[in-house]
């Protein structure tokens, strides 16, 4: 067995019974600075959001916990912000302290028979971790390539793509419980993972994720390809396994074609990704011709994108010709900032789409991003 330590992960002691120790940095470091009345728009992928009364950049677990606990003791509102890829912040900002999680580092115990048990700091950029996982021959994260945000956010939303969810790999999640003022570690079965849901999402202000431990098998061949569209792009049948690097390249190409890979020069990527979850409905609610995927509880998952498109809201739809927010020109499931959009522009667009789909199909779409200081 070998133990690998990457970056400044202060909660592991790399001197304990290690046969091999490596030190390196995953990805690049973004320079951020805190202060007073700091605009939050640059910290979100929608590029929307008013100022935080006070912004703290927490680069260590100690700094993160000290800031959160101090705010809680004083009764000051405190928002813990990850990569900003799944939030819509109101134009008035946040009247309190915003803590941007910027912790980093990774430790791994690897053995040929047991695979890799990998603990990653919450502030590590998710896609940088995916790149590293492929290099280390850890199987599974390749399907989740290109998803923006930080590792600590992935269990909250139980992020997923192309038939794979992060909850499949998670062994445990270490958190700070703000209600009980104590550290709590949850095993996978205690996380209540569901479709884009978890116990952490159910109580959004209670738990601060400190790190995530995941278990991976070893190899260069991917998990079986589950998603038909991806299998076609890979030139294989569903259920086949291919090189993990090939999966990543193809996933990135598919996501880029839908405007789902961040690009500062492409306004279609100024989004929160998929703005609505795919509805879970009874079989008799699925419109004729709509995709339908049976679930273990008897319900059916259908496509929010199909519903939006067939309700008359096509790519590039705006509520007005000069509106600065629109559906992506590449994919109707993303709401995008065309430049200068406010949170009000997004909530108006979202309400229009929700009401329209409900009027046509009787199905109410549910927004996926967390709403901070605004409502839909």
UniProtKB/Swiss-Prot annotation:
UniProt main location, coarse: cytoplasm
Under the heading Pfam families, the entry gives:
FAD_binding_4 (PF01565), MurB_C (PF02873)
What InterPro entries does its record include?
FAD-bd_PCMH, FAD-bd_PCMH-like_sf, FAD-bd_PCMH_sub1, FAD-bd_PCMH_sub2, MurB, MurB_C, MurB_C_sf, Oxid_FAD_bind_N
Catalytic activity line of the entry: UDP-N-acetyl-alpha-D-muramate + NADP(+) = UDP-N-acetyl-3-O-(1-carboxyvinyl)-alpha-D-glucosamine + NADPH + H(+)
| Cofactor dependency | FAD
Note the PROSITE patterns from the entry. FAD_PCMH
Q: Name one GO biological process term.
A: cell wall organization
Top-level taxon:
Bacteria
Q: Where is the chain membrane-spanning?
A: none
MF (Gene Ontology)? FAD binding; UDP-N-acetylmuramate dehydrogenase activity
Q: Which UniProt keywords apply?
A: Cell cycle, Cell division, Cell shape, Cell wall biogenesis/degradation, Cytoplasm, FAD, Flavoprotein, NADP, Oxidoreductase, Peptidoglycan synthesis
- Can you say where in the cell this protein is located? Cytoplasm
Which Gene Ontology CC terms are recorded? Answer: cytosol
Q: Might you give the EC number(s) for this enzyme?
A: 1.3.1.98
Q: In which pathway does it act?
A: Cell wall biogenesis; peptidoglycan biosynthesis
Q: Could you name the active-site residues?
A: 196, 274, 368
- Give start and end of each FAD-binding PCMH-type domain: 48-219
Family (UniProt): Belongs to the MurB family.
What's the stated role of this polypeptide? Cell wall formation.
Q: What is this protein called?
A: UDP-N-acetylenolpyruvoylglucosamine reductase
Question: Which organism was this protein described from?
Answer: Cutibacterium acnes (strain DSM 16379 / KPA171202) (Propionibacterium acnes)
